[in-house]
Amino acid sequence: MSFDQDSARYDERHRALALAFRRADLTFEQLWNRYFALGGNAGLIEVDAYLHGLTEFSALQHDILAHAINERLDETWPQRVPYSFPPRATGPHTGPLAGLVKLLDGMHQAPPELLPVVAARAGQALGLRITIYLVDYEQSMLHPLREPESPHLASLGVDSSVAGRAFRAVETVPSTTGQQPRLWVPLLDGVERLGVLDVVSPNGADLGDPELRLRCRWLSTLIGHLVTISTHYGDGADAVRLQRARTPAADLIWQLLPPLTAATGDFTVSGLLEPRYEVGGDAFDYALSPSTATLAIFDAVGHTLRSGFVAAAALAAHRSTRRAGHGLFEQARAMDETIAGQFSGGAFATGVLAELDLYSGRLRYVNAGHPEPLLMRSGKVVKRLTGGRRLPFGLGTGELTVAEEFLQPDDWLVLHTDGVTEARDHNGEFFGDERLRNFLEREAASAHPPPETARRLVKAILAHQNDVLQDDATVLLARWGKRNELTL
């Protein structure tokens, strides 16, 4: 650029600044105070002289002064003073970061129904076409979360489709539909399985590219988190996942449950309950920290809304005491007092409270009239945990003994309610302890992770009863000492 051109630009900026100052409705003192607060180092007299064209400023000092005026103009007038240097871009417009930013910005104050639209725009920033499929609460079908007025898409079976394979195994699976290559990417919130993403590249990008798959993983992680968050303030996602209305008792319990699966380092826990829409008194809970995993499972007497209230009270008493830093003794006592104090007529809940030291494998537990937990080691059910027996919660404290067991790396702990082993077929035959043991050992040989094992177990219990349960059936599976594989 020539000297004359440079001088002309300087004069233009100076004239614009002087004009803007007149419109800013500021005194020299007010302008200088703003300029000085932004880091300007010229004195009041120098600023006055510069505005009247009697002296010159460096480009940096001009821009600081211009910014002080622009801040005022933002309050009073739409025109702005031009800067010496072009302003930086306000955000990414292409690439993986642009896709993530579009998701975050797009879902800010957006209802759940807009999530497929926002996800599609995020995919476009990566040159991809993305469709969200959410798993239903039966974990049997994957249903599309469609954009408004988009073409109809068929639901896909968890046990009978490539998409279902990606969901079951928690791994990205490539496939080709017609001539169109695609990726099925597990949709996770943390390690909880929510569904899959259908990823297609309209531009013919190589879907085997590790960098592209990594970007899909980032999108999946954020979309999964947004699905969960949006469920707290809207029903759009649940409308897809719910295949029929829950009973009030079931809805109460579901709103109190933690995520169905969670993991920290080398510990994974996964729970599931059935029937999804009519569960009455079953519930489970857990809390994970770097050093400790706390587990709990409850079965309140009866199958009515009152049973749901008892289970909810037990869960709340357990959580509030645990969060206050108290141990198993205090947790059990709080549950006794809460149930006995709030419900008449002999209300109670059976249950197991357990606390695992994640450094040593030391397990401490209390069993309040509940089926005994099972310990699996090297793919075999090696023992029942028979200690720590006491009365059900709500029937009096009595004597309380905390039992101990030491786990070894890769051990599994299996907690369940009586609806699992007491499930009956049409001939009245129980599912039983032996069938449960055989099922767990077969699953261990298949190397399925805890959430898939829980899903298959509940499915087996339903099949044993011709899909009609006589009682709630809940399982809580925990594995310690093996790095979890529930990542993409």
Residue ranges and their predicted role:
Residues A42, V185-A205, P290-T294, D410-W412, ...:
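Short hydrophobic/glycine-rich mini-motifs in sensory/regulatory modules
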Residues P96-Q109, L115-E171, A368-G369, R390:
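Structured interaction and signal-relay segments at domain junctions
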Residues L126-L128, A245, A249-P258, L305-L391, ...:
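Catalytic core of PPM/PP2C metal-dependent serine/threonine phosphatase domains
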Residues V173-S175, Q180-D189:
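A short, aliphatic-rich beta-strand micro-motif
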Residues G195-R217, E422-A423, D467-V468:
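Regulatory loop-to-helix N-cap segments in sensory/regulatory domains
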Residues L207-T228, A312-A316:
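Amphipathic alpha-helical "output/dimerization" segments
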Residues L219-V279:
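Regulatory cytosolic signal-relay segments
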Residues T304-A324, L407, D411-V468, N484-T487:
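Active-site-proximal, acidic helix/loop segment immediately C-terminal to a metal-coordinating Asp/Glu
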